[in-house]
């Protein structure tokens, strides 16, 4: 044998991580793909290129990115590019040095972090804090489909193709199909609820609670099944060893790690972030627990799941973990995980092996029907509307990216064939695209906010109390809200809602400080606010804190307003001024919240822009000059109705300024008639010297702006309507310069940063949802 030629023909079993670049071999630059790092970078680049291309098309139909990840995997799979197979032998011919190994490692890390984050962010109290209905649904939705499928799993076993699977493996495959279709994975449900923005709705809470109960059953059965499989297929001794290992993991998690976590929380000052070293230590512990679980023949997600249970949701640890690792997990690791898992699908296997998997398809349909029924029947029994019952059942039956990881783990263990795996993934892909659209048509959370009664100030009965919901985001909102409330009559009912961005949690929380005083932190500004609002004379006050997602805050406000039968909601604007009236900052999140609130609230809305003058004069008992700019329309009439409530306060001097277009003529329009009636009533009131009335004629947009700016110098607070309907004067030249459309044209002029004035503004919109 020629030793030299033999050595020259050898392929090394080890591989290098990084290359010398294209210059290493100019004749064959693809030599860089013989190194693990460039190969992995190229794989990731291809994955995200296809994801971006696909999603740029699908997003125009309102489809979330998840189906794009799956479709990218199918394109890169055996049907077209076959990226896995091409990459497999790039590093070495040794199977242990598979070229897909590094990418597979990233995929597993994504699965681990997702399981951990979802467990941390879901409140364990959620399962049993929403009554008996979710407990019944969660229990039945697992037991009934599982037992129903188990009863028919042995049918049609006579004609099993031995080249497909052995009879015993076919039965095991059917059990996997039955159990996977009976289970409900929380990340999938949370994804759909978040996409539809109904996490804090009644339907969302019901489905989340039921899913958590179902998950408990599914996890227990899964652990038991793996122990039984180890007992039968490996050895009883190994099964006993694995059982002891699981018990040790549980004991270490709850008896050792949980006290350590509590110690970290206790030594972290309130309102301060937890030290980075603890955050990184938690993540390393999660990865170590996954390795431990895998070593003892359990699913590697068991360890992260247990550690997620012992980590307290929210600040300081939960929020710190979210801030440092969630963006990386959800935007990088999860797309890679989903695409990599989907690349293993071979759609042609479904066609070629249909005769072997048709009964699995039947089992999926059968168990899905049973789960749908067990979700609907309890809902209908509890008088839940039919469409909402269907929506709840669809959510319980939904499959998406979380199930992909479950299917892949069973495929890795050879419990299911590639044909069955591909069909399950295809069903998850179809679910991800169709379920959100179907749910949007079945369930609209805004329906409950539609006002079948007039919930505004103008239609309030004379002997009725004025019910106000005032919202606060920051400490500086408190003094402005209290000052404004002091101008109103003493017979008002005030609900204060403190809005807090949800961090480190998934499910929103609403805390009533009147019922749960012990949950109010004594040294926090919200405790000060509670005391300050309580000292308002002859005012009935209720206080809540809503901890929720930024894009769901408007829904929480609407829900509280509906429960409290509120006539008007007062919210701060996104602009912040210093005490001396200088512009300081603008909060775009608050502006977006106000815009959403204007579209969905079931009562009137008031957006308060405080330049400092209102807080200063209101708290120091100075007299206040209030001006109302009246042009016409229902918003202006509502603003006038609110201001007329202030006339009983001797500190408040009210002036109504009507702006009249030089081209205005009498009209039979209903709004014009109502405006005329309101103004006639106001002129009668003027005779009592409680409200002054004046008129000014304007000829166009520039004169409107000049008039409004001059008026701002004469008053401490100006109240205006947001929209003026058909009564609007010629606003030519003004609409194009509006910076804050949520305030309307006049409100935007008064809240402008260029306006040299200390005047505060309240922009009023009358109830829209009627």
Curated annotation (Swiss-Prot):
It is a multi-pass membrane protein. This is Cation/H(+) antiporter 12. It comes from the Eukaryota. Keywords: Antiport, Ion transport, Membrane, Potassium, Potassium transport, Transmembrane, Transmembrane helix, Transport. Its main location: membrane. The keyword Transmembrane applies. It comes from Arabidopsis thaliana. GO terms for cellular component: membrane.
